[in-house]
Amino acid sequence: MADLTVGYAAMLEQFGPREAVELTALAEQHGFSGCMAADHFQPWVPAQGQASFVWNVLAAVGERTTGDLGPGVTCPSFRFHPAMVAQDSATLEAMYPGRHWLGVGAGEALNEHIIGGYWPEAGERSTRMFEAIEVIKKLFDASVAGKDVKHQGRFFTLETTRLWTMPETPPPVLVATAGPVNAKRTGKYADGIITVGAPLEKIGGLFDKFAEGAREAGKDPDAMPKVLQLHLSWAETDEQALTNAMTEWPNGGMKFAKADIRSPHHFEAMAALVRPEDFAGRMVISADPDVHRAEIQRYVDLGFDRVYLHNVGRNQREWIEVFGRDVLPKLQR
């Protein structure tokens, strides 16, 4: 079983690239280890105000920090051909050996529809993602061996080529999922799983399916990374923590599927319907660091070995200092 690491979730839809890098470096100084950086072409709502290119930011994070780093998550299926994602990822790992992981997901219309193509239903998006992973892994494996490779599939074509800049060890491919079907496929075809905060019994079911898929492929699920991205709201008062959640991260209170919504302005209109009670069971909102510690510990006890924390407010520096002092040292594996 891997040791526990608690990293910083750099939300590039909220903070400009220079500030995101500074905050990640500050987090490491206060005991956080690693960075999960969001890949967005647009923010969730206009008030968030940013959407920088994740690979540029990760390269800068690598220069300023010593922990792991990866996109949380990128979609190798619409805006980006999987060959380009493979090249991005291989280059980052070549720059920072042993530190990079590739987090992928099936995509959301908010970011992916901008190229003007057909936006399929969820099942097809998942199928595209797993074919994209096949292309990425083909490129990784062939390139490590110094060979060319090609692919002709249902969704993607790759003519004979290789990655000419390729690290000795390919970065692990981690898949973001919240459903049991994809969790099983993730165990079978990927190297680890990423998910977000949810009821523990639901995540327990995901882990069961993930383990089932891994064993079918002859892999040990206990040796594969289990990664959590956890949104929370901390401030000096409960009232300010709630205000931060309502204004900065209203999407956290939306109890419906969001993958088909295309515009930050549409999200903004829907956010007007979000009420404080909508965050119940979805995100901890509290001024008490120990309340947050207890919530994080529950996920760690369930089996996560990496947790990336996102405080939804703009009070990042204060939050980093408080959690680095009062929360992280008290978490136990």
State what each model feature region is.
Residues 1-333:
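Active-site-adjacent structural elements that line small-molecule/cofactor binding pockets in enzymes
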